[in-house]
Amino acid sequence: MSGEKKEYPKEHIDLYQQIKWNGWGDTRKFLHQLKPSGTIAMTTPEVSSVPLPSLRGFIKKELTLPGEEDKPFVLDETPALQIENIHVDPPKQYPEFVRELKAFFLPDQLKDDKLARITHTFGKSLRDLIRVRIGQVKNAPDLIVLPHSHEEVERLVQLAHKYNVVIIPMGGGSNIVGAIEPVSNERFTVSIDMRRMNKVLWVDRREMTACIQVGIMGPELEKQLHKQGVSLGHDPDSFEFSTLGGWLATCSSGHQSDKYGDIEDMAVSFRTVTPTGTLELRNGARSGAGINYKHIILGSEGTLGIITEAVMKVHAVPQAVEYYGFLFPTFAHAVSALQQIRSSEVIPTMIRVYDPEETQLSFAWKPSKGAVSEFTSAMVKKYLHYIRSFDFKNVCLSIIGFEGPKKVVDFHRTSVFDILSKNAAFGLGSAPGKTWAEKRYDLPYIRDFLLDHNMWVDVAETTVSYANLQTLWKDAKQTFVKHFKDQGIPAWICAHISHTYTNGVCLYFIFASKQNENKDMAQYIEAKKLMTDIIFKYGGSLSHHHGVGYEHVPWMTRYATRGWINVYRSLKETIDPKDICNPRKLIPTIKEENNKEPFLFDVVNVKYPKL
């Protein structure tokens, strides 16, 4: 690399140390019980122990079997192991490879301590967290390298290719399908932590594009762009703890996708370092010169190489940003309104629709509002029940967002509100929208609390047509609850629509249950297979935005067809002949495809390895 090499600023080192190694998100943010009441509260960096007075009762109601409602509800303690009590095999040694690395990288860019290796072994799926919480850490990477530049990544990949070293890119570590987990300890494995590559390199206000290092985390990306008056406008649920590179590598989708598009719509070009050379694309509005090469890398999950820099479309920081809440009498009313809005060509920035069960969760998630607000809420409920004939067991909350120039927002708001009114929606004003905007990244923290108390929660998401949307929604919920309750295990499931298109939506399921007595993986595997098979039954996609990793590989041939799998396999063999780039992810091996070896996530021969 040309130029003088400088020490990296200490305040930016090791972001993985600021994120929970055995849970979700900020180490300073968590749910806990207040004593002696048992009320569940939330602590954040800004405020301590905010009571959520309805949440405990909600959990009891939904995770109690019929006939057991009068039994005492005890939140059993099932704490995670402390890191000092977790065994991790020592890293393998590869002196020749490491010697050449040390000639090019600073000592501070190479890590092999226990915390670094554990945090670069797993993502944040339920299966990941269960394993790390009980100390089942296998195949931890032997070394973590933290590059500063494209040139350093090039050098690292060249050395990995030379010495046949496995390389796995790591962004924020929020993936939930096994995309960043090393799957074997046969070869020396390096996790490439991209988070020091966190700069907006330039912004072109005329073309409205920006060149960005892809290790930048969501909040820092928007902070740097805002200084130059622009925004990317991409904020997935993982926004606080994910990177631009992760978004590109998994075909991410953000809350504002209805207006700005998904990540592939924002990407103009990028640089990708592969074992056989660096791939670069020309910038431009579009090209008709052959296949769309950027789509070879988009969604490739590090299996072809390492994305280092990307030119992205940006837009001016919006003049007006508004969010509003509405209640629909039923899910069917909400879907009808949503489809009419998409057909009207007057599209909000964001439309989210919560089904009745998730609507009740959102109500239970709220802190106490005070006597006046509670009285007002009670009066609204009476009005909706007696005058509008709303059944509160069926009501659905919706959050609608608008961004842009004030006049444009005014026009879109008026048009959209008219459609909502014609579909029996009741306006709640801007307060629910403001609350959603402030708390939109908080819900994942409930999973850590449930795991600490002998319960679990997981998710499944898909793209489904409007024709099949409601039948999939009903069948999945009924089948899931029945499957577990028939075994004497309480279960709960909800869903929301998070992204909309003219020909379908993203339907996102959240489901929970109590852990079984064996504390094994049976329930997780059953739930994963059950939900994925139901999604396929109704023509849904294998994933809308979570990706494939290795957990979805068992379904990939069924989803993508063997022909496309072979095309991708041939491409990988050409670009990555030694299979050093994130092996056994995204597509099945030939042996897996022909039933000569089990899948890494073996849902086909459903076996339940006891943990």
Curated annotation (Swiss-Prot):
Where is the protein localized? Peroxisome
Top-level EC class: transferase
What changing H545I does, per the record, is: Loss of activity
**Locus of motif Microbody targeting signal:** 609-611
S-S bonds: none
Domain FAD-binding PCMH-type, first and last residues per copy: 137-317
Active site residues of this protein: Y508
Any one GO CC term of this protein is:
peroxisome
The UniProt entry's GO biological process terms, in alphabetical order, are:
ether lipid biosynthetic process
Per its UniProt record, the required cofactor names are: FAD
Site (described: Important for enzyme activity): R352
Under the heading SUPFAM superfamilies, the entry gives:
FAD-binding/transporter-associated domain-like, FAD-linked oxidases, C-terminal domain
Keyword set, alphabetical order: FAD, Flavoprotein, Lipid biosynthesis, Lipid metabolism, Peroxisome, Transferase
The record's EC number reads 2.5.1.26
Tell me the subunit arrangement. Homodimer.
Q: What is this protein called?
A: Alkyldihydroxyacetonephosphate synthase
Q: What organism does this protein naturally occur in?
A: Dictyostelium discoideum (Social amoeba)
